Amino acid sequence: MNFVIPSFIPAIPEIVLLTLTSLLLIADTIWSKRSEFATYYATQLILLVVGYLVLTSFSTSQVLTFDGSFVRDAFGDILKLVIVVVSMGIFLFSKEYLLQNKFYRGEYFTLGLFGVLGMFVMVSAYNLITMYLGLEIMSLALYAMVAMRKDNQHALEAAMKYFVLGALATGMLLYGFSMIYGATGSIQFDEMAQIIASGNVDNVVLSFGVVFIVIGLAFKLGAVPFHMWVPDVYHGAPTAVTLYIGTAPKIAAFAMLYRILVEGLPGLVEDWQSLIVMISVLSLIVGAVITLVQENLKRLLAYSGIGHIGFILLGIIAANPDGYSAAMFYTIVYSITALAGFGMIVALARTNNEFDLVADFKGMNKRNPWLALMMLFIMFSMAGIPPFVGFYAKVVVIEEVVQAGFTWLAVLAVVMAVISAFYYLRVVKVMYFDEPEDNTKIEPVSSQLNWAVSFVSIALLLLGLMPSSLITLCYNSL
């Protein structure tokens, strides 16, 4: 048996990220005594370096390494760059929140970097084992981050629920993986697709495997009926952690969905398509209806996020390259919009007020007109109101669903989008037309956070004015 040394070049960003994060974990014990910001700045520098490595080695063709278990392609590189940008925004927003709430720790940043590493591995995984490895790296980091606030009973409860349900979902995924492996005799996505296409497989075992895999994927995405953890974890976790969970991991979960179903199981499209139709419909309805009664903004964004996941799944249902690129575009747009939404809450939060209730935004236009305008941009984009980019994200997905012959599904999506616009516009109404409960001004937001919120919010408008470039980029990557 000949041992061939694999090419490490396609995985250089991941290797550098793992090495620097491990070194940072050790260095943090020294830095924490000298400079409380050293770990933060080192984290941002590491992300810049990794982003630069991805950008300079951008792959326009598919490159496999590590015996075909790791793939480097344009699809993966684009998602990795978005993960890097979103993660830098997360850490920028989180720094002051952690300081004000007296649990600024280097572990938040190192765990966050390990989470990014897991996302990178998931995005580039090309077999079932590598995908599981990336998923566990990301998940373990997230469990620990949710439980970081040891003195907060709600955070500990959220962490326990997240861990138990996460373990259950992982078990479902592994059971599905074992069935697919048992039926095909391979864990490589391309080989699985070829074997299934040949027809020499047990379709019953494959069908059961697909069911368990889709259930596991639905949990990771937070789709109905496997969404039980989403509102409680979003609400119970510290807002800085909610900001992390609600943004970048969604990109990795979408990549996981695409790699397994589209690249690994295209021959079973009729099986997984019908399941995803059901999950998407439930997510759209639950996400729109239950959000109507939410008064806590974090829970509101959690339930509305479930509705957005329903839209992402619509693109997958189309089962063609245009549909997949529309879903990819929606995922990127949603992650940026969620970053802006949760970032606004983090920026306004204070030690004695988390600023996470809709009522907290009453009369915000009188207390801080600029931030009220930025919040309006965020809410309009989430609602899908032109000319913001959220509108075009919904349009391209609905268009592809109609082209694929699911007109009834497109009509349902439009109706749910109209219903969901109500609770986003309610926040705008509260800011501009309700009187503040007290006449005190909102405590000044630091210039750094002010610029960050403004940049991300205005980006939602600018991307909406020229969406074709990002849509084309997504299409060409597949």
Curated annotation (Swiss-Prot):
It is a multi-pass membrane protein. It catalyses: a quinone + NADH + 5 H(+)(in) = a quinol + NAD(+) + 4 H(+)(out). The chain crosses the membrane at residues 7-27, 46-66, 74-94, 109-129, 163-183, 204-224, 237-257, 273-293, 300-320, 328-348, 371-391, 405-425, 451-471. Keywords: Cell inner membrane, Cell membrane, Membrane, NAD, Quinone, Translocase, Transmembrane, Transmembrane helix, Transport, Ubiquinone. It is found in: Cell inner membrane. One of its GO terms (biological process) is ATP synthesis coupled electron transport. InterPro entries: NADH-Q_OxRdtase_suN/2, ND/Mrp_TM. GO terms for cellular component: plasma membrane. Pfam families: Proton_antipo_M. GO terms for molecular function: NADH dehydrogenase (ubiquinone) activity; NADH:ubiquinone reductase (non-electrogenic) activity; quinone binding. Its EC number is 7.1.1.-. Its main location: membrane. The keyword NAD applies. Belongs to the complex I subunit 2 family. NDH-1 shuttles electrons from NADH, via FMN and iron-sulfur (Fe-S) centers, to quinones in the respiratory chain. The immediate electron acceptor for the enzyme in this species is believed to be ubiquinone. Couples the redox reaction to proton translocation (for every two electrons transferred, four hydrogen ions are translocated across the cytoplasmic membrane), and thus conserves the redox energy in a proton gradient. NCBIfam families: NDH_I_N, PRK05777.1-5. PANTHER family: NADH DEHYDROGENASE. NDH-1 is composed of 14 different subunits. Subunits NuoA, H, J, K, L, M, N constitute the membrane sector of the complex. This is NADH-quinone oxidoreductase subunit N. It comes from Hydrogenovibrio crunogenus (strain DSM 25203 / XCL-2) (Thiomicrospira crunogena).
